[in-house]
Curated annotation (Swiss-Prot):
<keyword id="KW-0378">Hydrolase</keyword>
<dbReference type="InterPro" id="IPR000008">
    <property type="entry name" value="C2_dom"/>
</dbReference>
<feature type="binding site">
    <location>
        <position position="331"/>
    </location>
    <ligand>
        <name>a 1,2-diacyl-sn-glycero-3-phosphate</name>
    </ligand>
</feature>
<feature type="binding site">
    <location>
        <position position="659"/>
    </location>
    <ligand>
        <name>a 1,2-diacyl-sn-glycero-3-phosphate</name>
    </ligand>
</feature>
<feature type="binding site">
    <location>
        <position position="520"/>
    </location>
    <ligand>
        <name>a 1,2-diacyl-sn-glycero-3-phosphate</name>
    </ligand>
</feature>
<dbReference type="GO" id="GO:0005886">
    <property type="term" value="C:plasma membrane"/>
</dbReference>
<feature type="domain" description="PLD phosphodiesterase 2">
    <location>
        <begin position="654"/>
        <end position="681"/>
    </location>
</feature>
<keyword id="KW-0677">Repeat</keyword>
<dbReference type="InterPro" id="IPR011402">
    <property type="entry name" value="PLipase_D_pln"/>
</dbReference>
<feature type="domain" description="C2">
    <location>
        <begin position="1"/>
        <end position="125"/>
    </location>
</feature>
<feature type="active site">
    <location>
        <position position="338"/>
    </location>
</feature>
<keyword id="KW-0106">Calcium</keyword>
<feature type="binding site">
    <location>
        <position position="186"/>
    </location>
    <ligand>
        <name>Ca(2+)</name>
    </ligand>
</feature>
<keyword id="KW-0443">Lipid metabolism</keyword>
<feature type="active site">
    <location>
        <position position="331"/>
    </location>
</feature>
<feature type="active site">
    <location>
        <position position="661"/>
    </location>
</feature>
<dbReference type="InterPro" id="IPR035892">
    <property type="entry name" value="C2_domain_sf"/>
</dbReference>
Length: 808
């Protein structure tokens, strides 16, 4: 049957099944299940029917469970489904849930051919068995479907069209106007680092300093300090730049929070309870979160610190529940405080929030210099972080692992949305109700209100997005209808906020010229990976972001227009690079890149163009290499012989860890948050995440390129990574720009990987060390099977024992 590209939005309604014969599960499997239920005391012999929606084999929707309606289950549920899939059928599967999985009742098929032109299909469809024969009793399912092609969407390729843009639709939080946003590159930027970057209106870009601002915000709070983190470490200090000291700046984070709590400020912390500490990953050098130490530190103090496991929503099976609580994390990184009014004159207070990728823990403090060896006796002497080598320590010396990250401060109405997110999470998992009652403080803390006038050219519109479910957030609606109205997705008995993925999809679809991504991971859209040695349906990394990116590039090639996507990822995901988990993730990353390059090459060939696909999609990593200087820290011990550690120390090089979770579109729109480009972060029912999407309505790419704060921020990042500014960087979509960036990054990679080192690396942006064949296969760069100083394959390796759910 012919496959069609369904790129757009599918509206689907699942009504009911007319009649199911006999009900229940008969035969051999039913007997086994009855024994299991009897033995472990879960479940009873009632039917628990639900339906799923698939585009071929990619699951895109599921209804709630209807209990004890064996003959005529009625769901009446509607779905708004983003799709970017090749499919011949929309498949509806009816299943009976049970404690260890589910039993297939049958499947109904609606050909995509009938939908692709946009016609509405509303009908009863026959339910068939595995052999495509009608099931006993000739049952039918009533469904309604309508497909909306992306190219007919008024926002497709249009960017943000000024005041008419209302934000990402179908989301829990709506767009807020009159906000202020501060963007942070790294935890700290030293004075004089950023050169003059011109902005609109004769202004120049001014960098902000994340940990200084967090320190000030906590220090100046009077009523509340709310913190969530994947990890929070009490022993770090936030102020470390000797040229920018602050009163009390040498105090540790733990002491600062205890001090504020003793002054009567309500200090509440939700820190992920690393319950198994994910045993399979632990030995690969991952996950040292200090959760127990942090909880013990605050015991018997005025600080309320709750270790918060990633509990499943109640709807999953017994097996799924085990998966969620042992495999997934709370990943949001937020600080919410009350702050003084912008003028500083009034006694009134307002809410200020921080959202992004930087946890308040060890290993995170860094500057755009990202030194490997030169801060080991100063800023990093008591904060030496190097989890990629077994047995690494400050006594054995560098290289430490430098940390590149991005964060934001939000002021105005959106700051309250971050506060409400914290309150929802605290009420669900925080235990005691000790939240500040803001109604009682309404004469002190102003209600959500703009902090910028509508005609101020520096105003921002901001929208908050999440990946979270009812297991982690209190007060989600109970029914699918209410959930849909609140911009939530209903699952198989859980309610999910998946708006971060929606925000990325919408931003990519709107994009006109270029996209710049920095992310700790880059894998997904597994429904379209090549299936030579895997069963695609077992992977389930189904989020759409990589596919949306390649389809955007393809659409531009078809129209004869320039478009470039730049992606910066770490050399490898943090951990011992030879380990099974790191190698598995690199393998998924390779498959993702390959899928995208094949799309691009196919589109170029259709236009009879033989061109380097890296002119359209190009991947980078960050690294540093430093010559030895006199007066440097001298370690008292030495790493093991023939280890990655000693080789990296002698070669004086290491990757800069890209922990960022950011996307910039056309210099007019930015997403910053905690969510990685992988299934864990984008799913909604796996890791909990938070992100913001923002733009300045006076700085849009309508008649000329945008030259507001987002443009300045990107140029500052490119200066950090490339060690230079260039006029070609002003228009990243142009062939001159992408070729220059690729050329410079290629040169820097050669210097990084070379035997000898005469000078410091002039910049940090390195070509990601892969090649792309004429067919789109991702190959080794000649002579680069392994990352320098390691025995770790650049292209990764499939793991035979780690389940994909853990590494995707």
């Amino acid at each position: 049957m012919a496959h069609y590209l369904m790129h757009g939005t599918l509206h689907a309604t699942v009504y009911e099944v007319d009649k199911l014969h006999s009900g229940g599960i008969s035969g051999f499997f039913g007997k086994i299940l009855a024994n299991v239920e009897g033995t472990i005391g879960i479940g009873k012999g009632v039917t628990q029917l639900y339906a799923t929606i698939d585009l071929e084999r990619a699951r895109v929707g599921r209804t709630r469970i209807i209990k004890d309606e064996p003959n005529n289950p009625k769901w009446y549920e509607s779905f708004h489904i983003y799709c970017a899939h090749m499919a011949s059928n929309v498949v509806f599967t009816v299943k009976d849930d049970n404690p260890i999985g589910a039993t297939l009742i049958g499947r109904a098929y609606v050909p995509v051919e009938e939908l692709i032109r946009g016609d509405q299909v509303d009908r009863w469809v026959e339910i068939l068995d595995e052999d495509k024969n009608p099931i006993e009793g000739d049952s039918k399912i009533h469904v309604k479907l309508q497909f909306f092609d992306v190219k007919k969407d008024s926002n497709w390729n249009m960017g943000i069209k000024g005041a008419r843009y209302l934000g990402v639709p179908y989301t829990f939080y709506s767009q807020r106007r009159g906000c202020r946003v501060s963007l942070y590159q790294d935890a700290h930027v030293p004075d004089g680092f950023i050169p003059k970057i011109p902005l609109a209106g004769g202004k120049y870009y001014e960098p902000h300093r994340c940990w200084e601002d967090v320190f000030d915000a906590i220090t100046n709070a009077r009523h509340l300090i709310y913190i969530t983190g994947w990890s929070v470490y009490t022993e770090i200090t936030l102020i470390r730049d000797s040229r920018r000291p602050k009163p009390g700046g040498d105090v540790t984070l733990g002491e600062l929070l205890k001090q504020k709590a003793s002054e009567g400020v309500k200090v509440l912390m939700l820190v992920w309870d690393d319950r198994t500490s994910v045993g399979l990953l632990k030995k690969d050098g991952l996950m040292a979160t200090h959760d127990e130490e942090t909880a013990n530190y605050f015991q018997n103090t005025d600080v309320h610190c709750v270790l918060c496991p990633r509990n499943p929503d109640d709807g999953g099976s017994f097996v799924q529940g085990l998966q969620i609580s042992t495999m997934f994390t709370h990943h949001q990184k937020i600080v919410v405080v009350d702050g003084e009014m912008p003028s500083g004159e009034s006694q009134m207070r307002r809410i200020v929030s921080f959202v992004g990728g930087i946890d308040l823990c060890d290993g995170r403090y860094d500057t755009p210099f990202h030194s490997l060896f030169r801060t080991l006796d100063t800023a990093h002497h008591d904060d030496f972080h190097q989890p990629n080598f077994a047995g690494s320590s400050i006594t054995k010396g560098g290289p430490r692992e430098p940390w590149h990250d991005i964060h934001s401060r939000l002021e105005g109405p959106v700051a309250w949305d971050v506060l409400f997110n914290f309150e929802q999470r605290w009420r669900q998992q925080g235990g005691k109700d000790v939240l500040v009652n803001l109604r009682e403080l309404d004469n002190i803390i102003i209600p959500p209100s703009p902090v910028m006038f509508p005609d101020d050219h520096e105003t921002w519109n901001v929208q908050l997005f999440r990946s979270i479910d009812g297991g982690a957030a209190f007060g989600f609606p109970e029914t699918p209808e209410e959930a849909a109205r609140a911009g939530l997705v209903s699952g198989k008995d859980n309610i999910i906020d998946r708006s971060i993925q929606d925000a990325y999809i919408n931003a990519i679809r709107r994009a006109k010229n270029f996209i710049y991504i920095e992310n700790q991971y880059f894998l997904g859209s597994s429904f379209d990976w090549s299936s030579d040695d895997i069963k695609r349906e077992d992977i389930n990394a189904l989020h759409l972001i990589p596919k949306e990116l390649s389809l955007k590039i393809v659409s531009k090639i078809e129209r004869g227009e320039r478009f470039t996507v730049y992606v910066v990822v770490p050399m490898w995901p943090e951990g011992v690079p030879e380990s099974a988990s790191v190698q598995a993730i690199l393998d998924w990353q390779r498959r993702t890149m390959e899928m995208m390059y094949k799309d691009i090459i196919q589109a170029l060939r259709a236009k009879d163009r033989e061109e380097d696909p890296r002119n359209y999609l190009t991947f980078f990593c960050l690294g540093n290499r430093e010559v030895k200087k006199s007066g440097e820290y001298e370690p008292s011990e030495r790493p093991e012989d023939d280890s990655d550690y000693i080789r990296a120390q002698e070669a004086r090089r290491f990757m800069i860890y890209v922990h960022t979770k950011m996307m910039i579109v056309d210099d007019e729109y930015i997403i910053v948050g905690s969510a990685n480009i992988n299934q864990r972060s984008m799913d909604g029912a796996r890791d909990s995440e938070i992100a913001m999407g923002a733009y300045q309505p006076y700085h849009l790419t309508i008649n000329q390129p945008a030259r507001g704060q987002i443009h300045g921020f990107r140029m500052a990042l490119w200066y950090e990574h490339l060690g230079m500014l260039d006029d070609t960087f002003l228009e990243p979509e142009n062939i001159e720009c992408v070729q220059k960036v690729n050329r410079v990054a290629g040169k820097y990679w050669d210097l990084y990987a070379s035997e000898l080192l005469e000078h410091d690396l002039p910049g940090h942006l390195l070509r990601y060390p892969i090649g792309v064949s004429s067919e789109g296969d991702v190959t080794e760069l000649p002579g680069t099977e392994f990352f320098p100083d390691t025995k770790a394959r650049v292209l990764g390796a499939k793991s035979d024992y780690l389940p994909p759910i853990l590494t995707t």
